[in-house]
C-alpha cells in the first residue's frame, strides 16, 4: 500500500461496526494499519479484536459518553471518526403512523448520535490540529422513499446539512469533515430483505433484486454496491491522499440518484 493511503499509527472509532457497512469499514481501516475501536448495542458471540469493542447504544447521551470515555482510555486520543450507525425501525404505514416517539428515535439514531460524539471528541482533535470525521448519510436524504423511512430520510438530510456546516467551522483548524452517501448496499440485512420479497412474489433472488432496483427508479450499473466498496471509499477519505477534501459528500449508489 502506498504511504499516502496507509493509516499506520492512526487511531479510529467506527460506530455500528459489527455488521454490514460498519464491519467492512473496520476491516478496511485495520488493513490500512489503523488501530480501530468499534461500538454497537450488543457484542457478537465471535468478534475479532474483542478488546477493541465497546458495548453502547450511541443513540443515547449516556451511550455516547461511555464511548467517548473508552476512546480516551483505550486509544489515548483519536484521528479518525466514522459514524456508520443509523437505520430505521419505524412501522409500515407511512406518515400517519409515525408518532413523536418514532420521529425522536429516528433523530436520535441518525443525527444526535453523531452530534453528541462529535461534541465529545472534537475538542481533542482540534487541540492536536488534525483529524477526520466521516458521516455516513444516505441517498434518501435527497431521494426519500415513502412509507416507513420518511423519518429516517429526514434525519439523514439533517445529518448531511449538519456535517456540511461543521466542516466550515472546523476545517480551518485542521479537522476535515466528509460525508459518504450510499444507495442500496448489499449487506446481510439487504440480502434477507431481497429473499423475503422473492418468497412474497414467487420469484428467485435475481428477480427480487430487480424488484428492489425498480422501486428505487433503477440502478444504471445494474447492481447494488457491496459493503467493501463503501469501506474502500471511507478508507481513502481517511487517508493522506484525501488531505484536500473536506465538506464534500460522496455518493456511491451505482447512479441511482438521477439529478446532477
Residue ranges and their predicted role:
Residues 207, 218-230:
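A conserved structural motif in NAD(P)-dependent oxidoreductases
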Residues 171, 176, 245-247:
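Short, small/polar-rich loop/turn modules that mediate ligand/substrate recognition or access, typified
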Residues 2-4, 92, 143, 223, ...:
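Short C-terminal tail/terminal secondary-structure segment
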Residues 91-95, 99-107, 133, 215:
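Substrate-binding pocket helix/loop in short-chain dehydrogenase/reductase
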Residues 123, 168-169, 243:
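Alpha-helical segment proximal to the catalytic Tyr-Lys
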Residues 134-158, 163-172, 184-185:
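Catalytic loop of short-chain dehydrogenase/reductase
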Residues 11, 18-19:
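Conserved glycine-rich cofactor-binding loop
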Amino acid at each position: 500500500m502506498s504511504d499516502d493511503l496507509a493509516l499506520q499509527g492512526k487511531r479510529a472509532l467506527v460506530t455500528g461496526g459489527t455488521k454490514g457497512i460498519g464491519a467492512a469499514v473496520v476491516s478496511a481501516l485495520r488493513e490500512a494499519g489503523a488501530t480501530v475501536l468499534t461500538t454497537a448495542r450488543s457484542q457478537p458471540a465471535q468478534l475479532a479484536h474483542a478488546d477493541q469493542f465497546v458495548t453502547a447504544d450511541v443513540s443515547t447521551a449516556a451511550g455516547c459518553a461511555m464511548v467517548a470515555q473508552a476512546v480516551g482510555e483505550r486509544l489515548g486520543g483519536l484521528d479518525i471518526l466514522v459514524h456508520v450507525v443509523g437505520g430505521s425501525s419505524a412501522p409500515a404505514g407511512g406518515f400517519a403512523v409515525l408518532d413523536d416517539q418514532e420521529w425522536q428515535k429516528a433523530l436520535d439514531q441518525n443525527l444526535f448520535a453523531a452530534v453528541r460524539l462529535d461534541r465529545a471528541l472534537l475538542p481533542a482533535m482540534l487541540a492536536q490540529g488534525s483529524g477526520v470525521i466521516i458521516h455516513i448519510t444516505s441517498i434518501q436524504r435527497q431521494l426519500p422513499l415513502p412509507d416507513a423511512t420518511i423519518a429516517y430520510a429526514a434525519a439523514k438530510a439533517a445529518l448531511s446539512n449538519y456535517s456540511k456546516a461543521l466542516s466550515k467551522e472546523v476545517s480551518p483548524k485542521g479537522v476535515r469533515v466528509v460525508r459518504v452517501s450510499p444507495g442500496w448496499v448489499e449487506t446481510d440485512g439487504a440480502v434477507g430483505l431481497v429473499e423475503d420479497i422473492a418468497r412474497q412474489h414467487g420469484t428467485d433472488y435475481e428477480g427480487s433484486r430487480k424488484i428492489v432496483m425498480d422501486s428505487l427508479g433503477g440502478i444504471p450499473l445494474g447492481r447494488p454496491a457491496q459493503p467493501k466498496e463503501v469501506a474502500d471509499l471511507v478508507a481513502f477519505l481517511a487517508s493522506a491522499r484525501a488531505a484536500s477534501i473536506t465538506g464534500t459528500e460522496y455518493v456511491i449508489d451505482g447512479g441511482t440518484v438521477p439529478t446532477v
